[in-house]
Swiss-Prot record:
<feature type="region of interest" description="Disordered">
    <location>
        <begin position="443"/>
        <end position="468"/>
    </location>
</feature>
<dbReference type="InterPro" id="IPR007640">
    <property type="entry name" value="UL17-like"/>
</dbReference>
<dbReference type="GO" id="GO:0051276">
    <property type="term" value="P:chromosome organization"/>
</dbReference>
<dbReference type="GO" id="GO:0042025">
    <property type="term" value="C:host cell nucleus"/>
</dbReference>
<keyword id="KW-1048">Host nucleus</keyword>
<feature type="region of interest" description="Disordered">
    <location>
        <begin position="575"/>
        <end position="594"/>
    </location>
</feature>
<feature type="compositionally biased region" description="Acidic residues">
    <location>
        <begin position="61"/>
        <end position="76"/>
    </location>
</feature>
<feature type="region of interest" description="Disordered">
    <location>
        <begin position="52"/>
        <end position="77"/>
    </location>
</feature>
<dbReference type="GO" id="GO:0019073">
    <property type="term" value="P:viral DNA genome packaging"/>
</dbReference>
<keyword id="KW-0426">Late protein</keyword>
<protein>
    <recommendedName>
        <fullName>Capsid vertex component 1</fullName>
    </recommendedName>
</protein>
<feature type="region of interest" description="Disordered">
    <location>
        <begin position="176"/>
        <end position="205"/>
    </location>
</feature>
<dbReference type="GO" id="GO:0019028">
    <property type="term" value="C:viral capsid"/>
</dbReference>
<comment type="function">
    <text>Capsid vertex-specific component that plays a role during viral DNA encapsidation, assuring correct genome cleavage and presumably stabilizing capsids that contain full-length viral genomes.</text>
</comment>
<dbReference type="Pfam" id="PF04559">
    <property type="entry name" value="Herpes_UL17"/>
</dbReference>
<keyword id="KW-0167">Capsid protein</keyword>
<comment type="subunit">
    <text>Interacts (via C-terminus) with capsid vertex component 2/CVC2.</text>
</comment>
């Protein structure tokens, strides 16, 4: 609840410069695993209009749309394009609650008022609370725009989902419109009743009956602490029914001068030797939100207003591909309800948005099909002759006809399973993130390695041969018998110094024996985008991932994973804005890790 309140205040503070409607989301075990929730580091979001353009893009030309070349570095463009693309993403604050909870009970325990039409039990093993922004330029919301959500982990891995604004807003906008109409009608009725009441008050002496006016005058003339007798007259007016003690008590309660204690010319009792006994509000809490003057009266804090109004609706929203389901909390006192936002939901724009979305996600399948076509092209070119490139002992009695059948079925199975988790995408992502600066850094490291060392100038080059250098590859393991594909497995590859064949190990240094299993085929992709389609026995089809026909912007939009962007509004607990040390998930992150 604190995360949502803080984010709502942050969105309200910068609404004039960046018009966004806050969406308060809750992610649970249906979206993330327990390990993913506990290690989550960054939450990013961006808005894409119906034409597929990221809103809020930095000004610049469209040189990004040039088709990519064979060289992956040419496909990524320069640092300027990378920086322009990075600005379209915004970072959101979040909080991880790593314990089981029931959502509505948790909100009530936090002090919120929950007024739902139909309450439902929402059990969560853990929860991630965050707030994303939906752009509304000129107070106009379009149901055809798309909200992209990206979760990033410390190792650089990330997951993306896309949500249509129509699914997020349609029911809430209709409900908010009904609430505003009901509130307007209620206010109008109160005004009518108030005007009628004022008219009665102004002419009460003329319209009320004479008996009622007489009784009203009698009640006003009678003191409050003097009890009337049965005849309607006061007993303190000389009828002798009350004793002298009772009369003195009545005068004491009435506040006569003789019963008031006067302290004399001393200071007021709230001061001792000139010092205030009661601390002012400004001394107790200098960050009090409504403290314009120390002697002003206390006003209701925004937190109390937020809790008192509470939650009005809880919605479940699916992403465009119906892979994950999020929950959206709509608060009564969220600032956007007073902005009179207009909502447009046109079918034509919705179809345009879906077409643009399909074009964006088609980039990964274009890459996958390009790799498959390249494998078949190499097989036709070489006439089916494959060299052994990976170390593996092969029996002489091995049936190669079965291997070729296995290759065909394995490729079809891999095509059905491959997605953004594939080894191709994992090898491509770092190159897109690094840009031209990374290319210059690699060239500098290569020059440093090739330059002669001081000891080599004095004593000559060393003849001793050290262990072979390992490279980090990614693999897609196709298990034909199980009809299962393990995507994006990270491995370590090094050449055997005796045979020159590749030896593959896992991250712990254990030898991978996939090639010795007759039902397994493996696709390896190197950081330079060279790939090996390996059959049982270590015989491989080798080539390069071609990037012809793909726009640079489409590549970056879909696969780019940039470093952390320092954004405002990251301090959940302290309520401050210090981008140097952002605090997320309840712990402070060192600046060196960003």
């Amino acid at each position: 609840m604190e995360t949502h309140l803080y984010s709502d205040l942050a969105f309200e503070a910068r609404f004039a410069d960046d018009e966004q409607l806050p969406l308060h989301l809750v992610l649970d075990q249906e979206v993330l695993s327990n390990e993913e929730a506990e290690t989550l580091r960054y939450v990013y979001y961006r808005n894409v209009d119906s034409a597929g353009r990221s809103t809020g893009r930095a000004p610049g030309g469209d040189e990004d749309d040039a088709p990519a070349s064979d060289d992956a570095e040419d496909a990524v463009g320069g640092d300027r394009a990378f920086d322009r693309e990075r600005r379209t993403w915004q970072r959101a604050c979040f909080r991880v609650l790593p314990r089981p909870l029931e959502l509505l009970d948790y909100l009530r325990q936090s002090g919120l008022t929950v007024t739902l039409e139909k309450e439902q039990r929402v059990r969560m093993f853990y929860a991630v609370f965050t707030t994303l922004g939906l752009r509304c330029p000129d107070n106009r919301l379009s149901g055809a725009q798309t909200l992209h959500l990206r979760l990033v982990w410390p190792d650089g891995s990330y997951r993306d989902w896309e949500f249509l604004a129509r699914d997020l807003l349609r029911e809430e906008m209709e409900a908010n419109k009904r609430d505003r109409q009901h509130q307007l009608a209620t206010t109008t009725n109160h005004r009518r009743r108030g005007g009628l009441r004022n008219n009665l008050d102004n002419g009460s002496d003329r319209r009320l009956p004479e008996a009622a006016v007489a009784s009203l005058e009698t009640a006003v003339s009678t003191p409050f602490f003097e009890i009337p007798n049965g005849a309607g007259t006061s007993s303190a007016n000389g009828d002798g029914r009350f004793s002298n003690l009772e009369q003195r008590v009545a005068r004491l309660l009435r506040g006569d001068e003789e019963f008031i204690y006067h302290a004399g010319p001393l200071e007021p009792p709230s001061k001792i030797r000139g010092h205030e006994l009661v601390q002012l509000r400004l001394d107790v809490n200098p960050d009090l939100m409504y403290a314009t003057d120390p002697h002003d009266r206390d006003e209701v804090a925004r937190t109390d207003e937020w809790k008192g109004a509470g939650v009005s609706r809880l919605r479940e929203v699916w992403d465009v591909q119906h892979r994950v389901r999020l929950r959206v909390l709509w608060y009564v006192n969220s600032f956007w309800r007073s902005r009179e936002l207009s909502y447009d939901d046109h079918e034509v724009e919705l179809y345009r948005a879906l077409d643009a979305y399909r074009a964006r996600i088609a980039v990964e399948y274009v890459l996958i099909r390009a790799v498959r076509d390249e494998i078949y092209a190499v097989l036709r070119r070489d006439g089916g002759a494959l060299p052994q490139r990976f170390a593996c002992h092969v029996s002489r009695n091995m049936s190669w006809r079965v291997v070729w059948e296995l290759c065909r079925h394995a490729l079809a199975l891999w095509m059905d399973w491959a997605d953004v988790r594939s080894c191709i995408i994992k090898a491509l992502t770092p190159r897109l993130s690094r840009g031209a600066a990374a290319a210059a850094q690699r060239a500098r490291r290569q020059r440093e390695r090739s330059a002669p060392k001081p000891q080599e100038l004095l004593f000559g080059p060393r003849n001793e041969s050290g262990p072979p250098a390992e490279q980090t590859w990614y693999a897609d393991v196709v298990r034909c018998v199980r009809a299962q594909v393990d995507l994006g497995v990270e491995v370590r590859a090094a050449r055997c110094p005796r045979t020159g064949l590749w030896i593959v190990r896992d991250r712990r240094g254990r030898l991978r024996r996939w090639l010795s299993q007759p039902e397994v085929c493996v696709l390896y992709v190197t950081p330079d985008l060279d790939f090996y389609w390996v059959l049982p026995g270590g015989f491989a089809v080798s080539s390069r991932v071609t990037l012809h026909g793909l726009a640079q912007r489409a590549l970056r939009d879909r696969f780019q994973n940039f470093e952390a962007v320092l954004a405002r509004g990251m301090h959940v607990e302290a309520g401050r804005q210090e981008p140097e040390t952002p605090r997320v998930s309840g712990r402070r992150l060192p600046f060196d890790d960003l």
